[in-house]
Each structure stands twice: as structure tokens, then as C-alpha cells.
Design a protein with these regions (language model features):
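A glycine-rich helix N-cap at a beta->alpha junction
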Residues: 28-42
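N-terminal catalytic cores of NTP/NDP-binding nucleotidyl/phosphoryl-transfer enzymes
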Residues: 1-26
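Active-site cores that bind ATP or allylic diphosphates and position pyrophosphate for catalysis
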Residues: 41-367
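Short, high-confidence coil segments that cap the C-terminus of an alpha-helix
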Residues: 2, 35, 66-67
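Generic alpha-helical scaffold signal
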Residues: 20-24, 32, 48-55
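Short low-complexity stretches enriched in small and charged residues
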Residues: 25-29, 106-108
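Glycine-rich phosphate/pyrophosphate-binding loops
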Residues: 10-12, 39, 45
């Protein structure tokens, strides 16, 4: 027997969007489904590129001091292949090869795959999104010199982003699509029973489903109030994507902003994340790594793990007030996360449920 520790995005997610259901309800559902402890991936890493998303998650789990294996799903399910490709991407020759391929003018993903193919026979694995994340998890473990060992297992069911609802395990995209289309009953049938119950409870409380459209005018207002320099600050690579968003900021809907700004080199997911950074006040690269661990839900075994985490490399915040004893950088990160939670609440279907300050009142769900 072993404890199962999960790390999970909070109210905003890596695809550059609002989570349909709030983080504590999802974390509690995860514990009811077999996890023992769920930790929150702090906001700057939850809404980052695959590389930074993976690094934040791996850093948090490694810093907990209670994790020996890092298990994750991928399309190929072969740990050795994914880890070998991670080693190729960390090869000292790779950055120069990538720059050479980027000059062709293709997307970053295509250029990276071609550069990787010059060092590894398995570069085609980078065509699949969960293989990409798996490679990034392995890369992060190698970068950190961690003793945690990776363990890939094959994904089952629909492919990432598939809208096919006829499979036994449909994608989350399919469920979100049905909810957006008002097909609630069909969406609930596709959810795991525990998650369906959590959704119904949040729905009854006026807190679900949450969609970006609930805050669309506020997001557009934020974009229109930003200067060209503000947009440039979101573009770490200085590739011009910030300027494209600045030029598109006056469009009357977020879909129109995205449609005008996107190119082959700047995919929609990246643009959605940048818009979310603008709305929430996230500055990419402001923090090198997570600064604290924050549990969202736990059962009895999870509470025992939390007791062992008193000697973790990062402070564990079971109460929000504990952050006041941490350094200024940690307090600034927590302040960013509390503001983001307040903005998320404004997208609730029932505005009366969107009282600000919940992050200071709510602790982990103990089951």
C-alpha cells in the first residue's frame, strides 16, 4: 500500500481558461475517487506552457518529501522512451538546433520536433499532447536531480480535445462542450459518478458551471486598458505575439481577439494563456519555482502525509493566515492567487454566490 498524492491546477487551467468547477470541489472528488492528498499547483505554473506547468508540478511534488514515484498518463505509456526523449531535449546541442529550425518560420511545436529528431529517433512522440507533458515531467526530474522516478502509463479513451461522446472515456473537452451547449444531462452521464455529484452540489450553490464568457466584458476591458508595453511584458521570448494581441485588443469579443491574433506560430492555447495572464495580473517568469505547498483536500492517509510534510522543503499552508509569516515573495504570490480566486468567483452563474475573500476563509477539505 502507498499514499497517493496529486497536484492539481486551481481555478484556472493550462489551456488558458476558467475551470468549469472550482478547485476544492474537484479536489474533494479526486480524494473520493482514490487520491489521499491533493495539492494545488500555484497559479503562475497552472496557466503556463507545458514546460513550466510540468516543472511547477514536479517541483511541488519533489519538495513535499513524501513522493517516490511520479505517475502520469501519456499516449505511448512508455517511461523509457519518454525519459530518453527528455534527455535529448536537455542535450547541450539542442538549443542551437531549435533556433535553426525556428528560422524556417513554423510553429514552435513543429520546430522543436524537427530539432529533437536530429538527436532522437523517438521525436514523433512530441506529436501527442500528453506525451509532450510526460517528456516535460521527465525533463523536470532530470533538471532538479530528483530521486523521484517517473512512471508513465497509457491513456485510455478519447484523444485529447476530442469531442466524441460515444467512447467509454470521453475527453474533458467533450464534457465541457456539452455543458456549453446546454446538454447538462448528457454531460453528467459522461462524468464519473463522484464528479457528477460534485457538479450538482456546486450547481445548486450557484457556483457551476463556470465559463470564461461570464467575465468576457471584464477581460475585454482589461485588454483595452493595457498599453503596448503591458502586452510586451507578457511576451517573454520577445517574438512579437504581444504586439499581435495589442493590435487585436479592440475586437468586440474574445473569440474575435484570438482569431485576429493567431498565426501558425502563435497557437490559440498560447494566446488564451496570455489573455488570462493579462486579466489576472500574472507576469511570466516572476517566480522561478513554487514557494509553498497548499493542500486542497485530504483523507485520513492524506492527513498522515501532511504530518510527515512538516519537514518538507517548502512551507505547507493549511491555513491562509500562515502566509503572513513567510517572506515577501511568498506573500506576493499568495496575494496574486487570492485576487485570481476573487475574479474566478465573478464568473459564477449566481453572482450572489461570488463573495470575495474566500481564499482567506476556506481551508482544505478533510474527508
Amino acid at each position: 500500500d502507498c499514499g497517493i498524492v496529486c497536484v492539481m491546477s486551481g481555478d484556472f487551467v493550462q489551456r488558458g481558461d476558467f475551470a468549469v468547477v472550482g478547485k476544492r470541489a474537484r479536489a474533494a472528488a479526486a480524494v473520493r475517487s482514490g487520491a489521499d492528498l491533493v495539492l494545488e499547483l500555484p497559479l503562475p505554473w497552472a496557466v503556463a506552457s507545458a514546460e513550466e506547468f510540468a516543472f511547477g508540478a514536479v517541483y511541488a511534488l519533489a519538495a513535499s518529501g513524501v513522493v517516490d514515484w511520479l505517475a502520469f498518463g501519456s499516449e505511448c505509456g512508455e517511461t523509457k522512451l519518454l525519459d530518453g526523449l527528455a534527455a535529448a531535449l536537455l542535450d547541450e546541442r539542442f538549443p542551437a538546433l531549435l533556433r535553426e529550425e525556428l528560422r524556417v518560420g513554423d510553429s514552435f511545436a513543429a520546430a522543436r520536433q524537427r530539432a529533437a529528431a536530429r538527436l532522437s529517433p523517438d521525436a514523433q512522440l512530441l506529436e501527442s499532447p500528453n506525451n509532450i507533458l510526460g517528456v516535460e515531467y521527465c525533463k523536470s526530474l532530470r533538471r532538479l536531480g530528483s530521486s523521484v522516478r517517473p512512471l508513465a502509463f497509457p491513456r485510455r479513451g478519447s484523444q485529447h480535445d476530442s469531442l466524441d461522446c460515444r467512447t467509454r472515456f470521453p475527453s474533458a473537452s467533450a464534457v465541457r462542450f456539452l455543458l456549453r451547449e446546454g446538454k447538462r444531462a448528457q454531460a453528467l452521464d459522461l462524468m464519473a459518478p463522484v464528479m457528477a455529484d460534485a457538479f450538482r452540489n456546486e450547481e445548486a450553490a450557484g457556483r457551476a458551471p463556470v465559463f470564461r464568457e461570464g467575465c468576457e466584458r471584464a477581460i475585454l476591458a482589461r485588454l483595452r486598458s493595457m498599453s503596448r508595453d503591458d502586452f510586451a511584458a507578457l511576451d517573454l521570448g520577445r517574438e512579437g505575439v504581444g504586439n499581435r494581441l495589442w493590435q487585436a485588443r479592440g475586437e468586440p469579443s474574445l473569440e474575435r481577439v484570438l482569431e485576429r491574433a493567431k498565426t501558425k506560430r502563435y497557437p490559440l492555447a498560447r494566446l488564451r494563456r496570455m489573455i488570462l495572464w493579462a486579466y489576472l495580473g500574472v507576469l511570466p517568469g516572476e517566480w522561478a519555482h513554487p514557494l509553498y505547498l497548499r493542500p486542497l483536500a485530504a483523507n485520513r492517509t492524506g492527513r498522515l502525509l501532511l504530518a510527515r510534510m512538516r519537514s518538507a522543503e517548502l512551507p505547507v499552508l493549511t491555513k491562509a493566515a500562515q502566509v503572513r509569516k513567510l517572506p515577501d515573495s511568498s506573500r506576493r504570490l499568495f496575494s496574486l492567487e487570492t485576487r485570481a480566486a476573487d475574479l474566478f468567483a465573478l464568473a459564477y452563474p449566481n453572482l450572489a454566490a461570488s463573495l470575495a475573500g474566500d481564499e482567506w476563509r476556506a481551508g482544505p477539505v478533510m474527508l
